[in-house]
Amino acid sequence: MSFKDIQGQDRAIGLLRRALDRDKVHHAYLFIGPDGIGKKKTALEMAKALNCRQPGPEGGCDSCASCLKIAKNCHPDLVHLKPEKTQITIDQIRELEDQLAYPPFGGRYRLILLDKASDLNVWAANAFLKTLEEPPSGNIFALLVNDPGELLPTLVSRCLRLNFSPLSPDLISRLLITDLGSDPEKAQVISRVSGGSLGRAYHLFEKFSEEKSWDKNLESWLRQLESLSLGRLSPLIAGVKDWLGSREQMQEALEIGSTCLRDILWLRNGLEDLVFLPAKHKERLKGLAFRYPERTWLKGYDLITQAALDLLRQVNPQLTWEMLWINMARAAH
């Protein structure tokens, strides 16, 4: 892979390539944009270009020892800072500082990649700020975020911002067909609900193809939404246990919920051709669509979006789910 293989990010990659060509790479970059649109791939290609023994116009050569090690994520000068459980801690930053005290092992530069920089807790973020203010030579930082508002403003100010754009539905649809062999109709539907994220589109394609993996979660959502009409909170709160799990599992559950409400809104407005969920659920969705005013479902969609943001910000998961359903019940009555 090289820079040219990263789809839909010509502007961000163009800025980065010009800096590499002129040997004027900034010490810290902030890659901004939704997940699944090429930020991490771009950071890895930057690591290749910085340390490749035979770099070309498209970055690394993909054949030298350095490029191959980076591709396999085993290069000693590629430091991937990941959260311990749910957060990047101050102890991890201190370990990183010890590592940065030494020059790069085998390449010109060491690249420190924070795949989810928003996972820095407040103590780690403040400690990391000192590192960015006085960066040891030979070290480049790449911080990946959905929104710069997720970070301390002082951290953002130390970085050069590169904005990554959501991909167009046409591009996502074409890639689903060529890369995964999707039929055109399914590719078109998935591309419309992917939010411009190729990673999410691939994920939806796989989950949709393995329909059983969605059924349990979807059944929980339909049951909860049907329980709204009872006007009682106890069954709604009791149902929260179905969704408590890892952060990835909870985000997937919210993704299914947002898809469910989106389909309800499509059905309510007579746009059946835009419905994403399997046809066997259509009658239950139709039954829900006209049970409440449209504003109830619009409010519900916003509440799910807010719950997903709360989980990203480390809000207590059980509290997040409980407040979601309390507010959904309020919106319904």
Where are these regions (language model features)?
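Short capping loops/turns at secondary-structure boundaries
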Residues: 86, 118-121, 144, 148, ...
